[in-house]
Amino acid sequence: MSATYQLALQQLTDSALPTGAFAHSLGFESYIHRGLVRDESTFSTWLQAFVSQQLSYSDGLALRFLFEGVDVGLLDGVLSAQLLAREVREASLKMGGRLLEIGGEVFPSAELEAYRGLVRAGSASGHQPLAFGVIARSLGVPLEEALSAYLFATVTSLTQNAVRAIPLGQNAGQRVLRQAHDAVAAAIHVVAQLCWDDFGAVSPGLEISQMRHERQRARMFMS
């Protein structure tokens, strides 16, 4: 293994990376509002469902297709179309925009600059999983490691946000993360088996909850 890309991957997935992930629940705040997520157990259940649904069939599959050579502009357009909840779509673009900006300064490459150029020209929007994937691929990170890092970084940021919002204790958050290991490993296996027709096949219940968040009266998060 290359220590160079390993260190770069750790930097890219560190919770201190200023992408704004702390401001997004990606739907779980709606479940808190409805009393469905209220403690360690119920959040862990929601999180594992989120990993097996949206993270696998949307973000994870986008990453795999990118590594397999599918045009980044095509994938960008499909992601914009399939992320039905406005706040979640905007979250992907805001965090993706920050990743593109940070990557351009810290991990510059011709591939990354080409994607940034598409975004500047208005030909692409700049989604988070694609920004991450372009940077990771240009660094020589293998697909499975990139998937594992991206999925677990998302799980970590959501858990940190749940610790504040529910609230949970710090140790409870760590137990949730440990319980998510198998879900992330299973998601990597599932993503490898999916086909193009599966791209964006997310649970309607999750999408509806994400849409409800827009009109929620009291909110801690932007999504």
Swiss-Prot record:
Q: Gene Ontology terms, cellular component aspect? A: cytoplasm
Entry annotated with the keyword Phosphoprotein: no
**InterPro entries in the cross-refs:** UreF, UreF_sf
Q: Name one Pfam family in it.
A: UreF
Keyword flag 4Fe-4S: no
TM spans, by residue?
Answer: none
Please give one Gene Ontology molecular function term for this protein.
nickel cation binding
Quaternary structure (record): UreD, UreF and UreG form a complex that acts as a GTP-hydrolysis-dependent molecular chaperone, activating the urease apoprotein by helping to assemble the nickel containing metallocenter of UreC. The UreE protein probably delivers the nickel.
Please give the function described in this protein's UniProt entry: Required for maturation of urease via the functional incorporation of the urease nickel metallocenter.
- Family membership noted in the UniProt record: Belongs to the UreF family.
Q: What is this protein called?
A: Urease accessory protein UreF
